[in-house]
C-alpha cells in the first residue's frame, strides 16, 4: 500500500465536548500522522463552499448551520491507505449503523451531528486539503 493523505474535520459537536485529544489519539493509534492542523470557526461562506456538492439537498441548510455553530478542527492525516483507514476509524455516517468502537459509535449524537468528517476518495481528499491548507502549512513527518 502507498502512503496517502486524507482530510479530516472534528466537527463542532465533538469540539464542544472536548474530544479533540481522544479523536487524535485514535488517528495516531491507527498509524495515521497529523501533518497539518488548525482550529477555526467556519464562516457561512466557507461552509457553503466546502459543502457545495450538497447544495439543493434537503439537509444542506442544516449542515451549513451546524458546521458554523462553533469551532472545528481541520487536519491532514498521512499514512498507509489513509483514506480507507480513516473512514474505518470514523464508522458509518449514521451512528446507529456504526460499528462499536468507531468514532461515530462512541461520540456522535445523530446522523446530523456525527462528530467527524473524512474524505471519501483521493480526488476529494486533494480538493478538501487544498480548501483549508496551503502547501507550506503541511509538514510531512517521515
Curated annotation (Swiss-Prot):
Entry EC number(s): 2.7.4.6
Name of the encoding gene: ndk
Catalytic activity: a 2'-deoxyribonucleoside 5'-diphosphate + ATP = a 2'-deoxyribonucleoside 5'-triphosphate + ADP; a ribonucleoside 5'-diphosphate + ATP = a ribonucleoside 5'-triphosphate + ADP
Stored PROSITE patterns: NDPK, NDPK_LIKE
Designated name of the protein: Nucleoside diphosphate kinase
GO MF annotations, alphabetized: ATP binding; metal ion binding; nucleoside diphosphate kinase activity
Assigned protein family: Belongs to the NDK family.
Its biological purpose: Major role in the synthesis of nucleoside triphosphates other than ATP. The ATP gamma phosphate is transferred to the NDP beta phosphate via a ping-pong mechanism, using a phosphorylated active-site intermediate.
Organism field: Aeromonas salmonicida (strain A449)
Matches recorded under InterPro entries: NDK-like_dom, NDK-like_dom_sf, Nucleoside_diP_kinase, Nucleoside_diP_kinase_AS
Complexes and interactors: Homotetramer.
GO biological process, one term: GTP biosynthetic process
First-tier enzyme category under EC: transferase
